[in-house]
Amino acid sequence: MSDALKDEIIKTFGTPCAVVDLNIVDHNIEHAQSLCNKAGVANRPHIKTHKSPVLAKMQIAAGAKGITCQKLGEARIMAEAGITDIIIATNLLGAAKCGQLASLQRQVPLKVCADNAVSLTAYSKAANDANRPIDVLIECDTGQQLSLIHI
């Protein structure tokens, strides 16, 4: 970025100001996707850092199978932007989250993750309330003690 452009950005927006060079972003997305393609693996980027439907759509256009969200609210924003292949990576607990999941599941088919029976029960209720099955990915602990289900 040139000094003149930096000065113009500071003058226009002040500081601090996040500036994203979309040419660099596009290059990085293409590079990450090419690595996945060469390895023969599906790319499902986690959007918890950028939280941007625009960037998520760029990732999908480059070849990502879908996206992964950390929270239900992130998934809702992505679904409202037209993204239809969404995994929610964390367990959703509580009646309020269950109701929100059912509401979103009526709009777009979701995949959720679970590592405990409480989450599975909540997902079953949400699927019944939505009148649509919910795909559940079971997270198993493979020795790193990051999950409640041990194999």
Predicted stretch roles:
Residues P16-C17, L22, D26, Q33, ...:
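Expand to "…catalyze enediolate/carbanion chemistry for C-C bond making/breaking, isomerization
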Residues T15, V41, A61:
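Short, basic, glycine/proline-bearing loop/turn elements
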Residues S2-A4, I24-L55:
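N-terminal glycine-rich anion-binding loops that anchor highly charged ligand groups
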Residues V25, H150-I151:
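Adenylate-forming
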Residues E8-I9, L35, S103:
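Short hydrophobic/aromatic segments of transmembrane alpha-helices and their interfaces
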Residues H46-I149:
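Active-site-proximal beta-alpha core segment in soluble small-molecule metabolic enzymes
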Residues S2-V20:
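Generic N-terminal amphipathic, Lys/Arg-enriched alpha-helix
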